[in-house]
């Protein structure tokens, strides 16, 4: 489990400890090392979740300063942080337009733990068959043509939790 003691170099620890009572805790998953070209979309998803009354535990995915923060952490600290946050989550929302081993791993871990998963992607992209072909009833895959549709999909998912 991720704790302040296990990551003394992580100066932003207080931001990742859940504080909201009664809010849905969401793990936001998106490509980090595979490319940050969708950072604006991650930020939009983060804002839509906050607006819907959810708490985003993995806020760092939408943080433009992520590389600076994570450069102070070991691989083991990042792994422990992310899995600790996933364990506390009511659901996982993954943006899967950009292929990412880490995102796929987080989706799989969430499903194994019986955590509902929403995978989002832009239209006309080659999303992995491991995502599109997954028959797990806890996983939903949705394409969004624009930000208005993206927000609506997110709000509907949160309300259904």
UniProtKB/Swiss-Prot annotation:
Q: What is its EC number?
A: 3.2.2.-
What Pfam family is a match for this entry? Nuc_deoxyrib_tr
So what does this thing catalyse?
A: a pyrimidine 2'-deoxyribonucleoside 5'-phosphate + H2O = a pyrimidine nucleobase + 2-deoxy-D-ribose 5-phosphate; a purine 2'-deoxyribonucleoside 5'-phosphate + H2O = a purine nucleobase + 2-deoxy-D-ribose 5-phosphate
Instruction: Name the GO terms of the biological process aspect.
Output: deoxyribonucleoside monophosphate catabolic process; nucleoside metabolic process; nucleotide metabolic process
Q: Does the keyword Hydrolase apply?
A: yes
**Domain of life of the native organism:** Archaea
Keywords of the record, alphabetical order, are: Glycosidase, Hydrolase, Nucleotide metabolism
What does it do?
Catalyzes the cleavage of the N-glycosidic bond of deoxyribonucleoside 5'-monophosphates to yield deoxyribose 5-phosphate and a purine or pyrimidine base.
- Report the sequence similarity comment from the record: Belongs to the 2'-deoxynucleoside 5'-phosphate N-hydrolase 1 family.
Name the record gives this protein: Putative 2'-deoxynucleoside 5'-phosphate N-hydrolase 1
Which species does this protein come from?
Methanosarcina mazei (strain ATCC BAA-159 / DSM 3647 / Goe1 / Go1 / JCM 11833 / OCM 88)
Q: What is the lineage of its organism?
A: Archaea, Methanobacteriati, Methanobacteriota, Stenosarchaea group, Methanomicrobia
């Amino acid at each position: 489990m991720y704790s302040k003691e296990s990551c003394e170099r992580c100066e932003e620890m207080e931001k990742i400890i859940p504080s909201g009572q009664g809010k849905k805790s969401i793990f936001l998953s998106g490509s980090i090392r595979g490319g940050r070209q969708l950072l604006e979309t991650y930020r939009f998803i983060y804002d839509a979740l906050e607006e819907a009354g959810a708490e985003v535990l993995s806020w760092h995915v939408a943080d433009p300063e992520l590389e600076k923060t994570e450069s102070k952490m070991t691989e083991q600290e990042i792994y422990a942080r992310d899995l600790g946050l996933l364990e506390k989550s009511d659901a996982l929302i993954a943006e899967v337009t950009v292929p990412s081993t880490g995102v796929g791993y987080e989706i799989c871990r969430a499903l194994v733990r019986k955590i509902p998963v929403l995978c989002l992607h832009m239209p006309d992209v080659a999303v992995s068959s491991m995502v599109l072909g997954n028959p797990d009833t806890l996983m939903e895959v949705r394409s969004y043509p624009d930000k208005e549709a993206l927000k609506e999909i997110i709000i509907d998912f949160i309300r259904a939790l």
